[in-house]
Each structure stands twice: as structure tokens, then as C-alpha cells.
Amino acid sequence: MPRASVDRIIRKAGAERVSDKASSALALALEEIGLEIARISRELSEHANRKTITDKDVRLGYSQWKRSRV
């Protein structure tokens, strides 16, 4: 994920300045979260006998991931 995108996310959260290490740490966390949501989405598409992951799979995968974290 581009550093500028990660910096922008952190700044949207209210930070005025962002260290390189903070950007790297958030980028790693976002990648791990994205991989988990993608895995769930793949399982949903396979359950529906499809090889293509759709936007609905991703939205449902995110919803399931979010519920599992509560």
C-alpha cells in the first residue's frame, strides 16, 4: 500500500504528523486485515460454486470479519 495513502488515513483520524514507522505499521496491519477479508470472501464464492469473488462477497466477508472481532 502506498505510504501516501496510509499517511492520509492516519491524518483523517486527526494526526498532524505521521512517522515512517507509524505508516509502515498501519500498512502491515491493513494488509493482514485485507488478507483475512479476502480469505473469507474466497470461501463465500466457493460456497456459491463460483471462482470469481464479487463485491457482494467482499462486503459480506467484511461484515463477517467485523462481527468476529466484537
Where is each model-derived feature located?
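Terminal helix-to-tail segments of small alpha-helical proteins
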Residues: 1-70
